[in-house]
Curated annotation (Swiss-Prot):
E.C. numbers: 1.3.1.83
Pathway: Porphyrin-containing compound metabolism; bacteriochlorophyll biosynthesis (light-independent)
Pfam hit, one: NAD_binding_8
One GO MF term attached to the UniProt entry: geranylgeranyl reductase activity
InterPro entries, alphabetized: BchP_ChlP_pln/prok, FAD-bd, FAD/NAD-bd_sf, Geranylgeranyl_Rdtase_fam, Geranylgeranyl_reductase
Family affiliation: Belongs to the geranylgeranyl reductase family. ChlP subfamily.
The entry's keywords: Bacteriochlorophyll biosynthesis, Chlorophyll biosynthesis, NADP, Oxidoreductase, Photosynthesis
Keyword hit for Nucleotide-binding: no
Organism, scientific name: Rhodobacter capsulatus (strain ATCC BAA-309 / NBRC 16581 / SB1003)
Domain of life, source organism: Bacteria
Protein name in the entry: Geranylgeranyl diphosphate reductase
Length: 391
């Protein structure tokens, strides 16, 4: 077997890369392990739906507001103006993406990546077939590694270690009688009892809901914290359907390619947003940039073109990632700071700028007076000049 491109990982990043390259007329293989549902909150913003042609039938819920809840129980409801955030179930969503790539011409393979063998200048991918258990081999011109936070393909790249948040959630049957539950609202808990350095969440998914939390600290019990969150949110009596956990990377790698024939994408490249943990949009975007870089390399024969994947992604999204990392570093590490963060969220201009950036995946236009006001409030809270509840 010979391919122009061999994509490892069938999530949003890998499926998008395979879809784009297959539509361009290239011979593409898409290898996925199958049989595992990616633990994920499942939120997709309008720009994702537009840019990647996501049909409405995949949306299990449409979110029109978000509630931010502080350690003392204060909360602010933030409306999503002029639109909604879609929610997807990753089991159905990811399979639909793989099917779409297959319909475009990508050859779907099911199995586990093993290694790359290089002989006489050729790049040979080796994987284990899920059905037969046999080692399979295929020659390819380029490999796209989109195999998640614990990527094995990443071993081919001189990559640095990625900081990880360990996320855990429980899928429950959506309640019908819990007073504080709104099927069109995402609830976000900034509370050190739930997470000492990240947040907890309740995300509606139509007939089900995702409730969970994340942390970088290895000695925190994710299950105990989620149990407490269920009690605090009034969801401890609802039926549990399944429990899932997974690492989430929170920093893009400095290098995404090996300078020869491999380029990374999605979680494998570390492109999950700090502060929010949002990854689906950035996985799609990273997959597209990886495909563009791979196609440039295939056309020119110059391995340097593989660097276009990271360069393009960081040019478009790097500033947003820096701002979100700064916000996480400043506000997520004590209940005093978390209380202050929720206080900031009471400001209507903060709400509008935050959701405009989230919905469209770009920084909002600079508005001198509003930016000055928000900057003053940040300084006042970070310096402790005002009480935590000051809005």
């Amino acid at each position: 077997m010979k391919y122009d491109a061999f994509v490892v990982g069938g999530g949003p990043a890998g499926s998008t890369a395979a879809w784009d390259m297959a539509r361009a007329g290239l011979k593409v293989a898409l290898l996925d392990r199958a049989g595992r549902i990616k633990p994920c909150g499942g939120a997709i913003p309008p720009r994702l739906i537009r840019d990647f042609d996501i049909p409405d039938h995949l949306l299990v819920a449409k979110i029109t507001s978000a509630r931010m809840i502080s350690p003392t129980g204060r909360f602010v409801d933030i409306p999503i103006e002029n639109g909604f955030v879609g929610m997807v179930d990753r089991e159905d969503y990811d399979e639909w993406l793989r099917e779409r790539a297959g319909k475009a011409g990508a050859e779907r393979l099911t199995g586990t990546w093993l290694r790359i063998e290089r002989d006489s200048g050729k790049t040979v991918v080796v994987w284990r077939d899920k059905v037969t258990g046999e080692e399979m081999k295929a020659e390819t011109r380029v490999v796209i590694g989109a195999d998640g936070a614990n990527s094995q393909v990443r071993n081919e790249v001189p990559a640095t270690k990625i900081p990880l948040v360990f996320a855990y959630h429980e899928i429950i049957k959506a309640p019908t009688t819990v007073a504080n539950y709104d099927p069109t609202r995402c609830d976000v808990y900034y509370d050190g009892r739930i997470s000492p350095d990240f947040y907890g969440w309740v995300f509606p998914h139509g007939k089900t809901a995702s409730i969970g939390m994340g942390t970088e600290l290895p000695d925190v019990s994710l299950k105990d914290c989620t149990t407490l969150l269920r009690q605090m949110s009034g969801l401890d009596k609802e039926e549990t359907i399944r429990k899932e956990g997974a690492p989430i990377p929170l920093q893009p790698l400095d290098v995404w390619d090996n300078g020869k024939d491999v380029v990374l994408s999605g979680d494998a490249a570390g492109v999950v947003a700090p502060s929010s943990g949002e990854g689906i949009y950035y996985a799609h975007a990273g997959g597209r940039y990886a495909a563009e870089a791979a196609m440039a390399f295939l056309k020119s024969g110059k391995p340097a073109d593989l660097k276009l994947a990271r360069a393009g992604f960081m040019k478009e999204h790097g500033t947003v990632f820096k701002v979100l990392r700064m916000m996480q570093d400043k506000y997520y590490h004590s209940d005093d700071r978390r209380e202050r963060f929720v206080s900031l969220c009471h400001d209507v201009d903060v709400q509008r700028m935050t959701f405009e950036s989230y919905m469209n995946k770009k920084m909002t236009k600079f508005q001198p007076l509003k930016n000055l006001k928000i900057g003053f409030k940040n300084l006042a809270h970070l310096s402790g000049l005002v009480p935590p509840q000051w809005t």
